[in-house]
Amino acid sequence: MGTGDGEGYTAEPEPKYGRVMYCDDVAAGPPIWQVEDASRVVDVPLRLIKTKPEDYYVLLVRGNSMIDALIPDGSMVLIRKSDVPEHGKIQVIWIDDRVTLKRMREDEDHGWTLCYEDGTRRTIPLGNKNLIQGDFVAVLPPLSRPYMRGE
């Protein structure tokens, strides 16, 4: 027990990671189904989290349509929740009950187009029923893997 002057007191180290919900796969190619499992989390470096961990989620990328943006198949990506389309940003978009990861482009008529980043210059027009699900933040290090809460 300390004397009140700091003797014998050991400060707890600041956490370096925040637990972020893992939400399964996202397409970097044709849209695929999204399955949320709030019981699975990923430890994410706090330097990547600008607000609180609850404002983020992690997805596993399937496909290579974002390879030129350095987001290859099998990447674990950190996403900040957002529902606002932003020109030039890589975002997660809900299309026909599925999600995909693409770069957003605003057209001259103020419509939106999703752009592949794989050298093909393919695009997908964004309709009124499509919803923005979040903004791409970073590709996580290879050792970042989901685990069950409480492990």
Tell me what each language-model feature is.
Residues M1-I67, H87, R98-V99, H110-G111, ...:
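Short, positionally conserved secondary-structure boundary motifs
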Residues D68-P72:
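A short glycine-leucine-enriched loop at secondary-structure breakpoints
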Residues G88-Q91, K102:
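Short beta-alpha junctions and helix-cap segments that line functional grooves
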Residues G74-S75, K89:
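Structural motif
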Residues E117-I124:
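Flexible, small-/acidic-enriched active-site or ligand-binding loops
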